[in-house]
Amino acid sequence: SIMVILAGVAIFLILKGLPAITANWETNHDLAGYQNKNWGSFWNYVAPLLWGSLWSSLIALVLGAPVAIGIALFISHYAPRKLAGPLAYVVDLLAAVPSIVFGLWGVIVMRPFLTPLAQFLNEYLGWIPLFRGPVSSTGSTMLAGGVVLAVMILPIITALTREIFLQTPRLNEEAALALGATRWEMIRLAVFPYARSGMISAILLGLGRALGETMAIALIISPSILFSFAVLTDGYNSQTIAGNIANNFPIATDMQRSALIGTGLMLFVVSLAVNMLARGIIGRSTNRTRKAPKIGKRA
């Protein structure tokens, strides 16, 4: 079953990562000065990597979640049936695109495209810490990585949110319209309150997808293992756990591989917690949907 597989993965990560987690990083030959820095302990090493994963995922959610919810709302309540079906299919099809393709698209298209925007943001909004320079001339920024991640999580958030919107009882919608509400007022007063928990769970599942992304981020940004809020600079971007593993695992010694697997364990725990929270919210939303009265089918 799924629980057996998860338990097996967790046991593997714990057994392989425990030597580096419990090791003395100041005296161990392979860990002292690993990646050109004296970390002192495993936790000092994993903290900036975990921050990089969370920071890039947060940027993706801020950029992608509103767009995904807007697309879902358009498909479910505004688009004609002849347009809604093909549009939903195209959005769902994005989920089948490999990560490496998104990464190449980010390198070839998005990095040059976003460079003028980065210069504009730095020139006029540089007083905000997020947009401080120096601006990258190559486009290898966290902004570019966040945009690509936003596109990658778009299908899952859109699909789940669309289904939640479509499950809104018609009785609620028709009651709002009967009271004289416009279509937008009906959506705001009847659909959004009903779908709130479902939208939150969809966003959390998108977060889980973004946390584990590897190749796209590894190709696009020029990262370092540090705490940074910068989104426009080159070389001062926080490295992600997945990207760090992909870049360093092939050349690592046994103890260094243990350290990398240990960081993977931390990512596994965070991703599992996020997905369990999302599933719990979805389960609560599903139970409420079953209890709600339904009248007819949606036109």
Predicted regions and their residues:
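Transmembrane-helix boundary motif in ABC transporter permease subunits
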Residues: 60-91, 278-287
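Interhelical loop and adjacent transmembrane-helix boundary motif
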Residues: 134, 217-268
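N-terminal signal-anchor/first transmembrane alpha helix
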Residues: 1-11
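Transmembrane alpha-helices
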Residues: 93, 97, 157-164, 168, ...
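Membrane-interfacial helix termini and adjacent extracytoplasmic/periplasmic loops
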Residues: 22-47, 102-151, 221-222, 232-235
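C-terminal transmembrane helix and the adjacent membrane-cytosol boundary/short C-terminal tail
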Residues: 162-166, 170, 246-299
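Periplasmic/extracellular loop-to-transmembrane helix junction in inner-membrane transport proteins
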Residues: 13-62, 80, 135, 247-258, ...
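Hydrophobic alpha-helical transmembrane segments of multipass integral membrane proteins
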Residues: 47, 51, 55-63, 67, ...
